């Protein structure tokens, strides 16, 4: 392999022919590979099968978990999530299996009713806006798009969103009602917000009195190294500045136990807790407390969660390493055609290919039997201005499948880049 940017047109043409020949070999294999979504693989979910042996239905206080009641969640479950999230049990609301559903419910709540500090429901705010760090989580963006918010992109950095941009925007525009954040091992870059970034979120001035930070701790215990990274707890930091009502923290066991049968939680201020309980009480009497109790009995406490996640780590690290090894071996020798993140946790690797090539790479992969998240999906309205970013999710396939998929992906990246370089020389 040689640097593509130093090749003559004849050399690039020969390289294209060789890559096309290799690509056809992958097509002939009849592959059905998927690295599109951040799903746990069967080997991870198998680790939690002990949950199904938890048949106890009586809480430590003698409550029958089979019955109605305890809208905020079982006390034991609130203690468990408070331990994991670093907050008090009374600041935790434990819900059903989907934290995304609770996020949707809270956006809907703001839209229909507003929050206690809102001058009016968000639905009555013309040209309402929401900040979206990019690249970010497509399902977050879809919720606020569904409710008619204009989505404003904010650049991500290795220490979190560009806070100079965030602070300027929220200080000047009272129609900006919130921001989406994945503060630990962000989706998709795998970045963790710095202490300074978290402090700035807590103390920043906002023109909107009802500005909300949707703080999604989806990967709070999803470490890929022996280093257990812990960051300041935003809710606790906000208390120092009297801004605790601006934050909703979320987490769930979706990528700890069973994605379709886990438990989710919100952490928020006392005032916010009273308000959301009032609104939720009209919608539901209680969530699945039997499942909450099963999770408490199985995971026990934060130490139990971390011990369980260490088993996940041992199974996931080889898959992440396989992707990065393929990138190093197959892309670096070709020159500056791509770069990628090296996350210490989470579920994704961000691959940035030469601008103008991401859609072509994704299409080439699809035609050879490898499904990736659509190019541009990590940006509002699925529009990546550079057409450069691809989110790689190596968690669900087997290690052999990840290795094959990574080799195919590299062929597709190189082929797309060579095609573009030849087109530019035409």
Regions found by a protein language model. Name each.
Residues 123, 236-317, 330, 418:
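Conserved core segment of the aminotransferase class I/II
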Residues 350-355, 372-414:
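Conserved PLP-binding active-site segment of the aspartate aminotransferase-like
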Residues 63-209, 220-242, 410, 414-425:
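Conserved core of the PLP fold type I
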Residues 2-72, 76-83, 367-370:
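N-terminal "arm"/small-domain region of PLP-dependent enzymes with the aminotransferase-like
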Residues 361-367, 405-410:
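Short amphipathic alpha-helices in soluble, non-transmembrane regions
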Residues 38-42, 99-100, 136-138, 159, ...:
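Short, solvent-exposed loop/turn segments at secondary-structure junctions
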Residues 310-324, 336-352, 366:
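Conserved glycine-rich beta-strand-loop-beta hairpin in the small C-terminal domain of fold type I
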């Amino acid at each position: 392999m040689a640097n593509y940017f130093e090749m003559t047109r004849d050399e690039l043409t020969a390289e294209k022919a060789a890559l096309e020949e290799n690509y056809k070999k992958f097509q002939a294999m009849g592959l059905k590979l998927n690295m599109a979504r951040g799903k746990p693989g069967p080997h991870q979910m198998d680790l939690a099968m002990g949950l199904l042996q938890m048949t106890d239905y009586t809480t430590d206080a003698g409550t029958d978990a089979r019955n109605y009641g305890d809208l905020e969640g079982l006390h034991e479950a609130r203690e468990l999530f408070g331990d994991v999230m670093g907050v008090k049990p009374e600041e935790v609301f434990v819900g059903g299996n989907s934290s995304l559903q609770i996020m949707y419910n809270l956006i809907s709540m703001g839209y229909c009713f507003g929050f206690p500090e809102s001058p009016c429901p968000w639905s009555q705010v013309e040209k309402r806006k929401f900040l979206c760090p990019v690249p970010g989580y497509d399902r977050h963006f879809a919720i606020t798009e569904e409710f008619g918010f204009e989505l404003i992109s904010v650049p991500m950095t290795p220490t979190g969103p560009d806070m100079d941009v965030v602070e300027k925007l929220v200080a000047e525009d009272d129609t900006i009602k919130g921001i989406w954040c994945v503060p630990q091992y962000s989706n998709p870059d795998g970045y963790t917000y710095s202490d300074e970034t978290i402090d700035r979120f807590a103390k920043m001035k906002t023109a909107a009195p009802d500005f909300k930070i949707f703080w999604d701790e989806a990967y709070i215990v999803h470490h890929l190294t022996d280093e257990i990274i812990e960051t300041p707890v935003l809710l606790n930091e906000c208390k120092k500045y009297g801004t605790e009502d601006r934050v909703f923290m979320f987490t769930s066991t979706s990528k700890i136990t069973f994605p379709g049968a886990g438990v989710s939680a919100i952490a928020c201020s006392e005032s916010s807790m009273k308000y959301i309980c009032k609104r939720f009480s009209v919608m539901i009497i209680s969530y699945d407390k039997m499942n909450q109790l099963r999770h408490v009995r199985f995971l026990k406490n934060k130490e139990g969660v971390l011990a369980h996640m260490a088993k996940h780590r041992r199974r996931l690290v080889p898959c992440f390493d396989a992707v990065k090894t393929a990138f190093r071996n197959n892309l670096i020798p070709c020159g500056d055609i791509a770069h990628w993140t090296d996350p210490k946790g989470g579920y994704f690797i961000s691959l940035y290919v030469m601008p103008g090539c991401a859609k072509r790479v994704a299409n080439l992969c699809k035609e050879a039997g490898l499904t990736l998240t659509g190019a541009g999906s990590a940006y509002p309205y699925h529009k990546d201005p550079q057409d450069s970013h691809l989110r790689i999710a190596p968690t669900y396939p087997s290690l052999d499948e990840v290795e094959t998929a990574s080799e195919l992906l590299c062929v597709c990246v190189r082929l797309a880049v060579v095609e573009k370089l030849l087109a530019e020389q035409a």
